[in-house]
Swiss-Prot record:
Involved in the secondary cell wall (SCW) formation of vessel elements (e.g. protoxylem and metaxylem), thus promoting tracheary element (TE) differentiation. It is found in: Cell membrane; Secreted, Cell wall. Keywords: Cell membrane, Cell wall, Cell wall biogenesis/degradation, Developmental protein, Membrane, Secreted, Transmembrane, Transmembrane helix. It comes from the Eukaryota. One of its GO terms (cellular component) is plasma membrane. This is Protein TRACHEARY ELEMENT DIFFERENTIATION-RELATED 6. Expressed preferentially in differentiating vessel elements in seedlings. Interacts with CESA7/IRX3, a subunit of the secondary cell wall (SCW)-related cellulose synthase complex.
Length: 116
C-alpha cells in the first residue's frame, strides 16, 4: 500500500480574490453614498439660501404726534396748563417675493414675476 504522502495533491487556490473584490465594492459603495449625501445637503443649503435671497422686505413707518394744550382753572382759582400728547405709529411690512408661475404661459421653464 502506498502512503498518503506520496499521492500528488494539487494545492488549493487562495480565496483571497473574492474577499478583496467584496471589500473594494463595499468601500466604493460607502464612498459613493457619502458623496451623494454631501450633494443632497449642499443642494438643500443652496435652495434655502436662494429662498432667503429672493425675498426682500420693505418696511413703511408712519409716525404722527398730536399735542393738545389746555388751560384749566384749578379748585382754588389757579390756572394750570394741561398738555396731552398722542403718538400714533403705524408699521407696515410689505414682503415681496418672486414667484414662478407655470400655469399662465404653460411652458416648462417659463416664469412670471409677480410682486405683491
Amino acid at each position: 500500500m502506498a502512503s498518503t504522502d506520496s499521492v500528488y495533491r494539487p494545492t488549493p487556490t487562495p480565496d483571497h480574490d473574492t474577499t478583496v473584490v467584496v471589500v473594494v465594492f463595499v468601500s466604493l459603495g460607502c464612498v459613493m453614498f457619502l458623496a451623494f449625501l454631501a450633494f443632497v445637503i449642499w443642494f438643500l443649503i443652496k435652495k434655502r439660501s436662494r429662498k432667503h435671497r429672493e425675498r426682500s422686505e420693505a418696511v413703511r413707518v408712519d409716525e404722527h404726534f398730536k399735542m393738545k394744550e389746555a388751560i384749566v382753572e384749578g379748585p382754588n382759582g389757579q390756572k394750570s396748563v394741561v398738555l396731552s400728547v398722542e403718538d400714533d405709529v403705524k408699521i407696515e411690512d410689505a414682503i415681496k417675493r418672486e414667484e414662478k408661475d407655470l400655469k399662465k404661459d404653460g411652458g416648462v421653464g417659463s416664469s412670471v414675476v409677480s410682486r405683491s
